[in-house]
UniProtKB/Swiss-Prot annotation:
InterPro entries listed in its UniProt record: Alpha/beta_knot_MTases, tRNA_m1G_MeTrfase_C_sf, tRNA_m1G_MeTrfase_TrmD, tRNA_m1G_MTases_N, tRNA_MeTrfase_TRMD/TRM10
Subcellular locations according to the entry: Cytoplasm
Keywords, sorted A to Z: Cytoplasm, Methyltransferase, S-adenosyl-L-methionine, Transferase, tRNA processing
PANTHER family: TRNA (GUANINE-N(1)-)-METHYLTRANSFERASE (PTHR46417:SF1)
Protein name (database record): tRNA (guanine-N(1)-)-methyltransferase
Quaternary structure note: Homodimer.
GO biological process, one term: tRNA N1-guanine methylation
GO cellular component, as recorded: cytosol
EC number annotated for this UniProt entry: 2.1.1.228
Recorded GO MF terms: tRNA (guanine(37)-N1)-methyltransferase activity
Sequence positions that bind S-adenosyl-L-methionine: G113, I133, G134, D135, Y136, V137, L138
Top-level taxonomy: Bacteria, Bacillati, Bacillota, Bacilli, Bacillales
Length: 245
């Protein structure tokens, strides 16, 4: 996969892209990154990338020209048609399902904005996706791009040490992940559930499925609105409801 990041602050990505999973992914050849400062594409001597909004109002708006030209530049270098992603609070709410969709792409371009917003022509004629990582406002799109990049790259084949790790993560199954424990079995009187020490793989798997569902039911019941429950899962939930009364 090839990932281009269009940003006014490329140095923000230096540490993130050279540590942990993202560093390993590059070493394995699973992904390449290019940081592009779109200020360098501004067609004026002062390299201005923003201007006052038509009609008045507070703040400055990113001009279309530098961003269009920067996207044209990286697209000409590509063998594949890219997904062009705009990070903004108005975008589609980001989910694990979206991460899995993007992980199938060969080339992704992220546009990180600043100031009051983008010229609307960027949205209408350049981008393929608008993504928001939550209902809050950040100073710019860089942090949001880092979140999306990390969640996508870890899904690429061969990136994680355990090929099943990404599939077992919270949200990949539609439910939150079950609790985890490691040694010691008794820490300051806090004990690991007996079933995990039993060696009975069938009971362990049942416990994990049940705890995954319970955690989702308690913490993110909204996820169950679109999740297709089995008959057994429905019985578990009914029992928990009775215990609450």
């Amino acid at each position: 996969m090839k990932i281009d990041v269009l940003t006014l602050f490329p140095n923000m990505f230096t540490g993130v892209l050279n540590e942990s999973i993202l560093k390993r992914a590059q070493e394995k050849g699973a992904v390449t990154f290019q940081l592009v400062n779109f200020r360098e594409f501004a067609d004026n001597k002062h390299q201005t990338v923003d201007d006052y909004p038509y009609g008045g109002g507070a703040g400055m708006v990113l001009k279309p020209q530098p961003i269009f030209d920067a996207v044209d530049h990286v697209t000409k270098q590509s063998e594949h048609r890219p997904r062009v992603i705009l990070l903004c609070p108005q975008g589609e709410r980001y989910t694990q399902k979206k991460a899995e969709e993007l992980a199938k792409e060969r080339h992704i371009i992220f546009i990180c904005g600043h100031y009051e917003g983008y010229d609307e022509r960027i949205r209408e004629h350049l981008v393929t996706d608008e993504i928001s990582i939550g209902d809050y406002v950040l100073t710019g799109g860089e942090l949001a791009a880092m979140v999306v990049i990390d969640s996508v790259v870890r899904l690429l084949p061969g990136v994680l040490g355990n090929e099943h790790s990404s599939m077992l993560d919270s949200y990949s199954s539609g439910l939150l992940e079950h609790p985890h424990y490691t040694r010691p079995a008794d820490f300051r009187g806090m004990k690991v559930p007996d079933v995990l020490l039993s060696g009975n793989h069938r009971l362990i798997e049942e416990w994990r499925q049940k705890e995954s569902l319970r955690r989702t039911w308690l913490r993110r019941p909204d996820l169950l609105e679109t999740y297709e429950l089995t008959e057994q899962q429905k019985k578990w939930i009914e029992q928990w409801k009775k215990n609450e009364r």
